[in-house]
C-alpha cells in the first residue's frame, strides 16, 4: 500500500514532485519520503512506460523544455556511467537519448519522458521519488 498521493506499481510507490531541486537535493528529499526512498530507477520497459505516464499526468505545465531527474548518475572523472541506481539496484534496462557530457540523468518531455538525457547536476529540475 502506498501513502496518499503516491502511485503503486510492482510493489513500489512513486510520486512526481513539481518543485525544482538539484540532483543531490532531490535525492536527499526522496530519502526523507520513506524507508528506501530514492529518485526513481527505471529497471524495465514496463516500468519506464508507467513512470512516463505518471510524469505526463502529474507534472504541472510549463513553457520551458522540461526534464525530470532519475536516480542515475555518472561516476568517476571519465564520466563512465555508474553500475547502479541511487537506490543500489543494478542497471538491467537502458533507454538512452542523445548523449552529452553531463553527469546526471533525467527524462525529457520531448520524448514523452521515455528517453534518458544527460543533464547538469546543479541545474534544478523537477523529479520523481520511488519508495
From Swiss-Prot:
Signal peptide: none annotated. GO terms for molecular function: metal ion binding; toxin activity. Pfam families: Lectin_C (PF00059). The keyword Secreted applies. SMART domains: CLECT. InterPro entries: C-type_lectin-like, C-type_lectin-like/link_sf, C-type_lectin/snaclec_domain, C-type_lectin_CS, CTDL_fold. PANTHER family: MANNOSE, PHOSPHOLIPASE, LECTIN RECEPTOR RELATED. Heterodimer of subunits A and B; disulfide-linked. This is Snaclec coagulation factor IX/factor X-binding protein subunit A. It comes from Echis carinatus (Saw-scaled viper).
Amino acid at each position: 500500500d502506498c501513502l496518499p498521493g503516491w502511485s503503486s506499481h510492482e510493489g513500489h510507490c512513486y510520486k512526481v514532485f513539481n518543485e525544482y531541486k538539484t540532483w543531490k537535493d532531490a535525492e536527499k528529499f526522496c530519502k526523507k519520503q520513506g524507508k528506501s526512498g530514492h529518485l526513481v530507477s527505471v529497471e524495465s520497459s514496463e516500468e519506464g512506460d508507467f513512470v512516463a505516464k505518471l510524469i505526463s499526468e502529474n507534472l504541472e505545465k510549463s513553457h520551458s523544455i522540461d526534464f525530470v531527474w532519475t536516480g542515475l548518475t555518472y561516476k568517476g572523472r571519465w564520466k563512465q556511467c555508474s553500475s547502479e541506481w541511487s537506490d543500489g539496484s543494478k542497471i538491467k534496462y537502458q533507454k538512452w537519448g542523445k548523449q552529452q557530457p553531463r553527469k546526471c540523468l533525467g527524462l525529457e518531455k520531448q520524448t514523452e519522458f521515455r528517453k534518458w538525457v544527460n543533464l547538469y547536476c546543479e541545474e534544478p529540475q523537477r523529479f520523481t521519488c520511488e519508495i
